[in-house]
């Protein structure tokens, strides 16, 4: 079997899984969790913001005085770590591709999957907190842990752990490094090999410092770059404010096939919007819970709510910023795609006399994609430790990730991306099946949280609240 045949097979399988199976299940899950949580993503938005504002400190009230200081990651650091993974090439290049292929209407469906999918993010992140365990230096958790402890299915948990390690630790990281190399070569003429070596060494330095260094790095870099990018989008929108009503009209009409002359159909818009929305905000995918579990909080729902806000931050702020930059520029039908379209759109939106699209996007891509590499690495580490907690194995994994980052920068990624789509779809289905079953615990915790809020308390959870799962919640005794 030659490479071309293998690429065709992989493309066909990934197409069926991502375009039909995963999209359908994601929508069903999003609606189901919205119903059983009674619209948590809408009715507790104010509480999400309040928690994020006060999330900079570590919350250790649920820890006994004689226990070591596990959970040295603040709620905000866990939020920044998850945003670091979410905000990457999908926000700049992925949105551009969605518009180029699915038309402006893809943005509408990206909003829909974010708004309703946020309920899935709440459930999975709350479960990650509930079933987290104590590691040597911090808490650890995620789907593999709640599948094992909540469902007692080790084979299922190990399957997920392998899939997320392959998808995030290797495949997605190679895509991120490839995008960085392309952007730096296009804008500054940096040889690809130089970028590859630089990323390889920088990745090793950061990931060898452990989760504390990873979280501190994300805590500093992610907010700065996100705010800078949003401000740029606002400047472009203000400079092209007369086009704003037209842009909103394009998005809505194209989303429902009323203006197919703009490109795409309702089916293409929906599929591209949902696919790119998932790749970007990761709601229901099973990746974010690995970051959510690291936070030290007094109640699992606190981190569930903060991670719900993360979906909004990623899609409704960052992705929407890219969309408006592209659509306000009026060049989305010029034949460009991916990161090149975003670069040209910034130039067009600001005007040629102050054009710096290539430069700014290259810098943004570097920071967004590199923080994604670091967060993706951590997701893999957490799941490798779940399978077999060995420092030697982790050190080998660190070296392999650095090698993959190097290789990703210098090789074609068509086949790798196809495999990544397949493993991403499978891990998403694994996770969604688990949270469909375990979601009842998140609902019980939510009721407990709201009850304490109404009583004027700062909610604190103890395992005795849910006696039937008390033996499996070792961090909440």
Language-model-derived ranges and their functions:
Residues 1-84, 89, 100-105, 406, ...:
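N-terminal alpha-helical transmembrane segments of multi-pass membrane transport
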Residues 2-6, 36-41, 90-95, 104, ...:
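Transmembrane helix-loop junctions in multi-pass membrane proteins
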Residues 15-54, 100-137, 313-321, 422-432:
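Extracellular loop-to-transmembrane helix junctions
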Residues 23-28, 156-165, 186-211, 228-229, ...:
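Transmembrane alpha-helical segments of multi-pass small-molecule transport proteins
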Residues 25-32, 37-49, 53, 178-184, ...:
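Membrane-interface loop-to-helix entry segments
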Residues 33-34, 113-137, 143-207, 363-373:
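Helix-loop-helix module between adjacent transmembrane segments
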Residues 61-99, 127-130, 136-144, 148, ...:
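Alpha-helical membrane segments and immediately flanking helix-loop junctions
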Residues 122-131, 136, 232-250, 264, ...:
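Extracellular/periplasmic helix-exit of transmembrane alpha-helices
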